Amino acid sequence: MMQKSPNYVKKRSYWIITHTLVAILAVLVGIRIGSNVTFRQLIGLTSSAFDNNQLARVVNRESPITQENVDFTLFWETWNRLEKDYYDTSKLDAQKMVYGAISGMTQAIGDPYTMFLPPETKERLDEDLSGEFGGVGIQLGYRDSQLAVIAPLKDHAAAKAGVTAGEYILHIKDDLQKVDVDTIGMSAEEAVNLIRGKQGTLVTLTLAQKGQDPHDVKLTREIIEVPSLELEFIDAPQGKTAHLILSRFGDKTVQEWDQAVTQINADKSVKGIVLDMRNNPGGYLEAGIDLASDFVDGGVIVSQKGRTSTQNYPASRVGRLQKYPVVVLVNKGSASASEIVAGALRDRRNAKLVGEQTFGKGSVQDAQKIGKGAGLNITIARWLLPSGDSIQDTGLPVSVEAIDN
């Protein structure tokens, strides 16, 4: 499953594991190109042409972009030749061609977290963070530039079938939709669109852990409604332990968290806290800062290193839980915002991290809303722990190794 207050200041910014943490559960006309020219201005596409599913007439062949080193001649020549020579005109869908061109532009950068999101994909990602969506219960991302399972969602189809974090997704098959494709070169949003579908229908995934043989898993799609936080109390002779199980940093996480904190502080027998962020792919950075702030007495929670400067993000609230000792549970499915919280508690509270080394997503995406309901996720920075360390691609090491049951 991070958006400028979008993930670090605005609420609608999030770190994409796309992890989703693209976390991403199977993810223009109006987009800015250059400094002051929109794609609509560049190609003169009309909404009526799209509505009629016809190839739009390009009226502005010469790019009005002011940069002298940008030449769109090859682009227009390709468009013209397809329009003129391609034998099956029914496949010349102007809208898809525009989306494909924009996707190619972002993919050319070579950063899997910088991506164009067509309206349907953008809508689905928003659903993911809201906690209600249809699918098989998998957060998608990348490992070694290959599509992979970041985290299976508890009590849903993938987890029940034994799917585990870190498995590569090699192939997707859906007989009903006539889908039978390898995932090499596939974007996270493409995989999301293929894996999601109508409730009760089947999709088969070919999965493999690194160095192991692939295996097929047949999953039945379902409607998924998942709270982001669960609280349970564990009794012990010396007092209760509050076990906070945090599955993502979504739209309702801070609200759910505040309710849990109230419960914990109301129970005078609570002596400690276990913050469980195993298989948490991330989400809104703002939520992560709020939660981490409850454990500390002010100070920096995370820093963001951009092109030209570094910005510090301090604690956003009074530390209501700072009197309790805390242990943090993580694993290889813990990514992005969950790594920020774990790292902040390690550096600021000397909290012990228990479990497995984390995923290692240390980049910041600005999740921008653009025309026609589409989205554009742009990597704008790396985030740094209070210690100044980056965990990009390396993850957080743990103090005590433990294997998930």
What are these regions (language model features)?
Residues G131-V181, A381-R382:
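PDZ/PDZ-like domain segments forming the peptide/carboxylate-binding groove
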Residues E83-A151, G200-T204, A208-L231:
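Extended, small/polar residue-biased N-terminal targeting/export presequences
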Residues S336, P386-I391:
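Metal-dependent DNA phosphodiester-chemistry modules and their immediately adjacent helices/loops
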Residues S90, A159, T164-A165, K173, ...:
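Cleft-lining beta-strand/loop regions that shape enzyme active-site pockets
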Residues A108, S390-N405:
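Conserved functional hotspot residues or short segments at active or partner-binding sites
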Residues K372-A381:
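Short acidic, Pro/Gly- and aromatic-enriched capping/linker segments at domain boundaries
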Residues M2-Y113, S145, D267-K268:
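Terminal targeting/pro-maturation regions of precursor/exported proteins
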Residues L170-H171, N377, Q392:
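Hydrophobic beta-strand signal
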